[in-house]
From Swiss-Prot:
It catalyses: 2 reduced [2Fe-2S]-[ferredoxin] + NADP(+) + H(+) = 2 oxidized [2Fe-2S]-[ferredoxin] + NADPH. Its cofactor is FAD. SUPFAM superfamilies: FAD/NAD(P)-binding domain. It holds the Pfam family Pyr_redox_2. Belongs to the ferredoxin--NADP reductase type 2 family. HAMAP family: FENR2. FAD binds at residues 20, 39, 47, 52, 92, 126, 287, 328. Keywords: FAD, Flavoprotein, NADP, Oxidoreductase. The keyword Flavoprotein applies. This is Ferredoxin--NADP reductase 2. It comes from Bacillus anthracis. Its EC number is 1.18.1.2.
Length: 331
């Protein structure tokens, strides 16, 4: 099958834009490869950005501690040096190797072509648990949010956060100094979040509504009010809002990856010491892959990324050296 003339064939296409994927993109640029990232979420950073942006990480080399979002921002800044192509809100449905050796990747939006593929999809594609109320779909991408990618857009707004876990509490605390008013709504009296986070929440100016559940959203084009119902007494209250943020957790799965002909062991892609899968030209790194002695840590993913890139480079360019120059001599 011939590639359409308007479709660029990339050297490396990375599936998954979490921390390992971002570092893979940077390293691919260092090897002078054309790189594309395909990410199913609306922003890069994977679970670090989507689930716990304000949490500190302590086991990344060179950082005594680093906020999850700060680490993501640094990785994005590092990656920018080589200006990779980034495709957001695209989930890869099919991945197949054509007769000419080029990989064809079909997403929910378009078709991509690549000489090699590196899968860095973490625990698999994950999607938010949505608010199950009538008419919610019409408010999505307006003022009903499942992700927070820019805190500043909530400045001076009246914001309601639904949820009781770490992410919901984290987002509430991040919004507290920015928003005009922020209210967190949880169906239980006690939060599931870390005790220290809950203590900080209770000592903040954020309003806490427990045990309440949302039962109705009111508004024409956008949500203007939310109706909350007390879990025990069924008493209803109405809150005026500018924005609603939902964090009921996420559901993750390998999804279509299971259908790509890869060797799968316990929901992970089996690779060898070169990060090669059973399909030549397809590699995997980070939490999505497994091998004997595998440890699932961000730090390990950062080590696996260069191995995958260097071997991918040698795959599509047999004249390339497997062992690269040291970065200190390249810039």
């Amino acid at each position: 099958m011939k590639v359409a003339e308007n479709q660029k064939v990339y050297d490396i296409t990375i599936i998954g834009g979490g921390p390992t994927g971002l570092f893979t993109a940077f390293y691919g640029g260092m090897r002078q490869a054309s790189v594309k990232i395909i990410e199913s979420l609306p922003q890069l950073g994977g679970q670090l950005s989507a689930l716990y942006p304000e949490k500190y990480i302590y086991d990344v080399a060179g950082f005594p501690k680093v906020r999850a979002q700060e680490l993501v921002d640094n990785l994005k800044e590092q990656m920018k040096k080589f200006d990779p192509t980034v495709c957001l809100e695209e989930a890869v449905d099919t991945l197949e190797k054509q007769a000419d050796g080029i990989f064809k990747l079909v997403t929910n939006k378009q078709t991509h072509y690549s000489k090699s593929v590196i899968i860095t999809a973490g625990n698999g594609a994950f999607q938010p648990r949505r608010l199950e109320l009538e008419g919610t779909a019409k408010y999505e991408k307006k003022n009903l949010h499942y992700f927070v990618d820019d805190m500043n857009k909530f400045a001076g707004k009246r914001v309601v956060v639904f949820g009781g876990g770490d992410s919901a509490v984290d987002w509430t605390m991040m919004l507290e100094p920015i928003a005009d008013k922020v209210t967190i709504v949880h169906r239980r009296d006690k939060f599931r979040a870390h005790e220290h986070s809950v203590e900080s929440l209770m000592n903040s100016r954020a309003e806490v509504s427990t045990p309440y559940v949302p039962v109705e959203l009111i508004g024409d084009d956008k949500i203007e009010q939310v109706v909350l119902q007390h879990v025990k007494t069924e008493e209803k209250i109405i809150i005026d809002v500018d924005d609603v943020i939902v964090n009921y957790g996420f559901v993750s799965s390998l999804g279509p990856i299971k259908n790509w002909g890869l060797d799968i062991q316990k929901n992970s892609i089996l690779v060898n010491s070169k990060m090669e899968t059973n399909i030549p030209g397809i590699y995997a790194a980070g939490d999505i892959c497994t091998y004997e002695g595998k440890v699932k840590l961000i730090a390990c993913g950062f080590g696996e990324a260069p191995t995958a890139v260097n071997n991918a480079k040698a795959y599509f360019d047999p004249n390339a050296k497997l062992q690269p120059m040291h970065s200190s001599s390249m810039f």
